[in-house]
C-alpha cells in the first residue's frame, strides 16, 4: 500500500499485490499491518507528552520510576554458565532508553552471551519460561532488569528493548495501562481507529499475512510467518510492546506522521 499526503490531505492512496499469497487475496487500501518497530515513534511521543506535562525529565534515572533497575549490573566476563558482573559506571537514564544507549539488547541478535540469557529468561519471546504465559510490562521490566547490561548506560548505541521499557515507565507515571494511555492521548485525538496491540475478530478480514524472504542459491522465496487472524496479534495480549507491538493501517499512521509534520498539531488539536 502506498500513501502520499500533501497539505494535510491524502493526495494518493493505492494498493497492489496480495494480503495472502496462498489464496491470492488482494491487498486493500485499509488493510491492517503489523507495524512492528514503527511502534517506537508512537511510544516516544507518549513519553514526550509526559515530559511536557512536567511528569518526568529526560535526565531522571530509570530507577526513579522502575525501582527494579536500581541494582542492575553490567556484564564483565565469562561464559553463559559462569560469568561475572560489575556495577555500571553511571545509572541508566530516561534519555538512554529513548536513544538506545541503555545497555539493553534484543533476543534476536547475535554475538554476545547476554543475548542467550534474553532467550532463556523469556525476554526474547516476552513469555514466562515456567508458566509459558505472556508477560505483562511489569513482569517484563523486572525480568529485563535482572539480566546483565551489555555495556555501561550512555557508553554507546545498541538497538534494544529500551522502548518496551519506556512503555512500563508510562504505565507507572500515568497510573493507567499503556494501551489505554495511547488510546486516550494519541489514537483517539488522531482518529487512528484501526490502531491497537491486537486486531479484533470483526477486522480479521483486513488483517494481512506476514512473510519472510528466504534467500538461497537456488532462488529467493517467501515463507509465511503469520496468518492474519490466527497469530498472537489476533486477540488481546498481555505484552503491550512499545517497541514493536502495534497493528495499524497506512491511513491511521499517516495521521500520526501529519501531526509530527505540523509541529504536534492535528485538526486544530495540539497533541504534542
Pin down the residues of each PLM region:
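Active-site SXXK
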Residues: 8, 34-62, 163-171, 253-256
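Short beta-to-alpha loop/turn elements within the nucleotide-binding domains of ABC transporters
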Residues: 14, 60, 176
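Short, surface-exposed loop or secondary-structure junction motifs
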Residues: 72-272
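Short, conserved catalytic-motif segment at the N-terminal edge
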Residues: 1-35, 55-57, 71-78, 83
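Surface-exposed, flexible loop/turn segments at secondary-structure boundaries
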Residues: 10, 43, 70, 105
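PAS-family sensory/regulatory domains
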Residues: 63-68
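Outer-envelope exported proteins of Gram-negative bacteria
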Residues: 1-5, 61, 160, 183
